[in-house]
A protein has these predicted regions:
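ATP-dependent carboxylate-activation loops
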Residues: 225-227
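Active-site metal-binding loops of divalent metal-dependent hydrolases
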Residues: 16, 230-231
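Active-site-proximal alpha-helix that buttresses catalytic centers in soluble enzyme cores
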Residues: 2-91, 95-97, 115-119, 195-202
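A short, structured active-site edge motif that brings together acidic residues
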Residues: 89-109, 129-140
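Conserved alpha/beta-hydrolase "nucleophile elbow" surrounding the catalytic nucleophile
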Residues: 71, 229-230
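Extended, charge-rich helix/loop segments that form flexible
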Residues: 121-188, 254-255
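Acidic, low-complexity terminal tails and accessory targeting/binding regions
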Residues: 1-10, 19, 23, 28, ...
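A structure-centric feature marking long, well-folded core domains of fungal metabolic enzymes
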Residues: 39-42, 109-113, 183-186, 215
């Protein structure tokens, strides 16, 4: 189902290390998960170095297409990885909503898609195309993630939809995210997005890739790169999950990707 190499057609890449990752790895503290300021975290200096180091693998590869998560850490990783690619002027990175992180703690949420678009766009060092977001979500792009919160009941969903609409207007998204994640803990909600939903997202994306690239799927001379997150990669790389009936945890045979590690995934 997956290999840790560059041999396949579809290469999934986890973003570089962030300060959140670093603190979480060192302290193993759950309290950091409820701090709104860590939403949409950027790369640490180590994470930037990891992405730059990945250039030595990418620069020798012919690129057919790049897809990227809308979160800052993935966008920044993408920029750093491709900024010295010999064909970078012809590479257009498609920012794709489906490949965002599994939504559960503050760190998993974006603060402002509008602000991210101001930094990462067609005028950046590497070109970023947000057409998918604009076509699917229109004026609601900043709130796209709300449709993924399937473990909230209807009343809870409507309550937080209003909270996020107001926060979006007042530019206080980090506070709304913090309120949501604390509410989850206080009300014993296992995860905000269900494991079943993230699984369905990965399958929908794989189906999209097959259909979109049907004419070149066997051409291994040009690669399709997906810059995404650990949670998304876990469900994208499991074989056993395809026959799974209950979705209560990560699949046991999934890939736990390191930061800026390339994973060749069978689509």
């Amino acid at each position: 189902m997956f290999e840790k190499n560059l041999n396949g057609k579809f290469l999934f890449v986890r973003h570089g290390l962030t300060e959140f990752n670093k603190i979480q790895n060192e302290t193993h503290s759950e309290s950091i998960e409820f701090i709104g300021e860590y939403s949409d975290a950027v790369l640490s200096q180590e994470g930037i170095a990891q992405a730059i180091n990945a250039q030595k693998f990418i620069n020798n590869i012919k690129i057919e297409k790049v897809y990227c998560s809308p979160l800052k850490r993935a966008l920044e990783t993408c920029l750093k990885i491709f900024e010295s690619h010999p064909n970078k002027d012809n590479i257009i990175i498609e920012v794709f909503p489906l490949v965002t992180e599994f939504l559960n703690i503050c760190y998993d949420f974006p603060n402002s898609i509008e602000e991210n678009k101001k930094i990462y766009n067609m005028n950046s060092k590497v070109k970023f195309n947000w057409k998918s977001f604009e076509e699917i979500f229109g004026e609601k792009q900043n709130l796209f993630f709300l449709s993924y919160l399937d473990n909230l009941n209807e009343e809870e969903y409507n309550k937080f939809y209003k909270i996020f609409e107001e926060a979006n207007k007042n530019k206080t998204m980090d506070k709304a995210i913090e309120e949501l994640v604390k509410y989850k803990k206080e009300n014993n909600i296992s995860t905000l997005e269900s494991y079943k939903h993230i699984f369905n997202r990965t399958q929908e994306f794989k189906k999209y890739l097959k259909e979109k690239h049907i004419g070149s799927i066997d051409d291994l001379s040009q690669k399709i790169i997906i810059v995404t997150h650990g949670g998304f990669i876990k469900f994208s790389t499991s074989k056993s999950v395809l026959n799974q009936k209950a979705f209560n945890d990560w699949p046991k045979d999934c890939c736990f990707a390191d930061n800026c590690e390339f994973i060749s995934v069978n689509i």
